[in-house]
Amino acid sequence: MSKLKELPLSALQFYATAPYACSYLDGRMARSQVATPAHLINADVYSRLVRAGFRRSGIFTYRPYCDECHACTPCRVVVDQFVPDRSQRRAWSRHQHLQALVAPLTYVEEHYSLYLLYQSMRHAGGGMDQDSRDQYEQFLLQSRVNSRLVEFREPPGSPEAGRLRMVSMIDVLDDGLSSVYTFYDPLERNASYGTYNILWQIRQTRELGLPHLYLGYWIADSRKMAYKARFRPLQVLTGNHWHAFEDEAGDAASPAPASNRD
């Protein structure tokens, strides 16, 4: 990089939030480190921050900064070495007929309705099922980086042609894709939309000639986050270096069982 291009990153400031209730591990308090100002975090700077363990929520870029707990571990799939297991192959076979449309981040009422339904059935009591349209847009549709929205529908000619099944937000980085958030039809209890979505993103990353799919944070003791260990080979960020997941996780490296959460 030239010095001129490095300026936005060197001009960033980082602050720690006040403690708040952890949304992944009951009874624990969490803190985040937030990068500011947001207008300096362009696609190039954001790619470097993601490699350092940051994520984003809307225009806010953050990473875990807890006082004692270090359960949140950044993880990424090495896509050119990935081989799906049997359950993942079944998920791909079950849903590969879905028609994917990649678009800019755009508000669609049908997407918002599916989001509320998903939150009410998959994360009841978390409060996000009460999100207003403004909250939904701030969370998922505001971005200063290279972001895309992908919707998955039943294809023309099928019994439920055009039915919306899933919506996913992704960021395009200089070394991969970053999976931001996904919500899907929770009424299909035997579906594996979550697994299929990650498989689809792995394939897209590979087709773009990029090496990594960033999946956010792996948390061994959180069922909502431990499933990421099923996508191997996985790398995790510890001590400012990316390592093979198995080398760092020890006994916790045993993949979480598949469930209907996917």
UniProtKB/Swiss-Prot annotation:
Gene Ontology cellular-component annotations: cytoplasm
GO BP annotation list: ubiquitin-dependent protein catabolic process via the N-end rule pathway
Compartment(s): Cytoplasm
Main location: cytoplasm
TM segment ranges: none
Keywords of this entry: Acyltransferase, Cytoplasm, Transferase
Reported function: Functions in the N-end rule pathway of protein degradation where it conjugates Leu from its aminoacyl-tRNA to the N-termini of proteins containing an N-terminal aspartate or glutamate.
PANTHER family: ARGININE-TRNA-PROTEIN TRANSFERASE 1 (PTHR21367), ARGINYL-TRNA--PROTEIN TRANSFERASE 1 (PTHR21367:SF1)
Protein name: Aspartate/glutamate leucyltransferase
Organism of provenance: Cupriavidus necator (strain ATCC 17699 / DSM 428 / KCTC 22496 / NCIMB 10442 / H16 / Stanier 337)
